[in-house]
């Protein structure tokens, strides 16, 4: 019996040792480019909340590369893979549990592994107004094999300061008189 325990312990140790190889390929999940926006009025009402009487949901579309995308409330989920692959969902209204505002619009996702000079995204607002959002992305692999990525977003040609650290999350205020105005850090 003692010999059997020793044999099993030895085989288990051998299996654990063999499973601890350091020569596996590293698969880097590069964060995708995704624009997320929150829109309020001057009084702080969430203009993307369907329960708010003056919401903008039905009046918003996005034009991108000769296509127009209306606001959708559901998206198709793709099968998980070992490496994260970005999936383009179009313009999605979603409820956020971790954001200062309850509802937001997400447009994307785009591959973060491409260097892009500048691409425009036109947000079509009520009354025929438009806000020109744009992004540029630089990406390269460092000599040690790690990815280096930098994404910058713009509103009407002005660079936006990312509210949550390079993830494309921005807060705006909308009025019929002034159009869309950027609100740094989601403050009024």
Regions found by a protein language model. Give the residues of each.
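Bacterial N-terminal signal peptides that target proteins for export
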Residues: 1-8
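Surface-exposed loop/turn and secondary-structure junction residues enriched for glycine/proline
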Residues: 4, 50-51, 163
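C-terminal motif of bacterial Sec signal peptides marking the signal peptidase cleavage site
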Residues: 16-19
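Extracytoplasmic cysteine-anchoring/structural motifs
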Residues: 21-29, 33-34, 38, 71-188
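N-terminal export/targeting and maturation segments
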Residues: 21-70
